Amino acid sequence: MKKAVHFGAGNIGRGFIGEILSKNGFEIYFVDTNKAIIDELNTRHSYEIGIASSSPEKISVSGVFGINNGENPKDVIEAIAQADIVTTAIGPNILPYIAELVAKGIQKRKEENKQVQIDIIACENMIGGSEFLEKKVAEYLSDSDKVYLANYIGFPNAAVDRIVPGQKHEDLLYVEVEPFCEWVIDESQIKNKSFKLEGVHYASNLEPFIERKLFSVNSGHATVAYSSAYKGYKTILEGLQHKEILSALKGVQKETRALLLAKWPQYFTEEDLMSYHQMIISRFANPKIIDEVTRVARTPIRKLGYDERFIRPIRELNERGLSYQNHLDIVGKIFAYQDENDSQSVQLQEKLSTMDFQRLIEEVTGLSNKKIILEIELVIKKYKNDSK
C-alpha cells in the first residue's frame, strides 16, 4: 500500500488532504504535536468527515496513523524515508519549523540509496508554499544532499480551497467541511510522475489559479470577516445578511476580476470569473457552515503582508492604473480590528497607539510606495476615528 506522510492533523489535514489521500489508496501518517489527536488516531486508525450541506453525508477515512513529532522525531524521519508522498497543512508560519525534520527524512532516503522520486507538497494559503519549504529544508542539507534532492525530490507548488470552520465535537477526530473542495498542483514541478491523485487538478502553470483562489476566496473571506467584526457580527453567515458587507465583498471581487483579467487574459474570461465569484458568495452563505469571525480574521498582521491577500492586489492594481478602493477600505478595517484573544491583533493595536502611522504601515506591509502608504494612513485614520 502506498504511504503518505502529512504534517498537520488539524481540521484541514483530516477534513481535506486526508480525504483525498485516502480515496487514492494511501495509508496516511499524520504528524502533529497534538498528543490527544495523535493518540486517538493510533487507537482507532479511522475517522469520519461530515459534509455540511442540505443533503448531509458522512465519509469514513481509514488506514490512518499518528506520529507525535515532538516526542518521536525519529519516527517522522523514518516515515518520510518510506513515503510515496509528503504533504503539509500547518500554516505558512509553521513551515520553517518542520524543515529540519523533512531534511533529515531526505538524508535518510539518500543514505538508504532510494532512487524513487517523491514529491513534497505544501498545501498552504500562500503563493509558492512548496518552494518556500524547499528553501528552508535546503538550509539543513550538505552539497551532496542537495544534488540528491535535485534528482529525486520535487517540491511542486499547490493551491488548496475548502472551507473548514472552527469546531468542537465529542469525537476528537470528527470534522465537518463544506461540499466544495479544490486542490491544484503545478504539474511542471512534479518529480514522481508514476501516479496522479484523483480529485486533484494538475496545471501546467499554477500561478493564475493560485492567484484566482487567494485573491478571491481568501481576500473575500477576510473582507466579510473584518467588515463583520467592524459591525459587531460574530459569524460570517450573520455578516453576509448585511447589505453593506455583501456590497463590500462584491466591490473587492470586482477589483479582483479586473486584476486577474489584466494579468491572465489567456486563462480567464469576465464570465468565468463572475460565475466563480458568485459561487464563492454562495459558499460563504452556506447555512450549514457556522464560521466564527474571529477564526477568519485571526493573525491580522500576517494578512497585511507584502504578498498577502490585500497588499499584493493593491500593489498590482496600482501598477496597472486600476482601482483598488474597496481593497484599501478593508485594509483600514484590518488595522482597526480588535480581538483581545489574538496576539497579533493586540500587538497591532499597541503599535497603532505608539508608532507613527506611516512607519507602522511600512513595517507591517513592507510597502515603500509613498502614495499607497498615504492612502492607507488616511483609511486607518477614518476607521480609528469612527470607532471612537
Swiss-Prot record:
Say yes or no: keyword Transferase present: no
Q: Name one GO biological process term.
A: mannitol catabolic process
**What Pfam families does the record point to?**
Mannitol_dh, Mannitol_dh_C
**Its Enzyme Commission number?**
1.1.1.17
Among InterPro entries, the record links this protein to: 6-PGluconate_DH-like_C_sf, 6PGD_dom2, Mannitol_1_phos_5_DH, Mannitol_DH, Mannitol_DH_C, Mannitol_DH_CS, Mannitol_DH_N, NAD(P)-bd_dom_sf
Q: Where does NAD(+) bind?
A: 4-15
In which domain of life is the source organism classified?
Bacteria
Q: Does the keyword NAD apply?
A: yes
Q: Which GO terms describe its cellular component?
A: cytosol
Any one GO MF term held by the record is: mannitol-1-phosphate 5-dehydrogenase activity
Q: What reaction does this catalyse?
A: D-mannitol 1-phosphate + NAD(+) = beta-D-fructose 6-phosphate + NADH + H(+)
- Keyword annotations for this protein? NAD, Oxidoreductase
What HAMAP family does this protein's entry cite?
A: Mannitol_dehydrog (MF_00196)
The UniProt similarity line reads: Belongs to the mannitol dehydrogenase family.
Q: Protein name, please?
A: Mannitol-1-phosphate 5-dehydrogenase
Source organism per UniProt = Lactococcus lactis subsp. cremoris (strain MG1363)
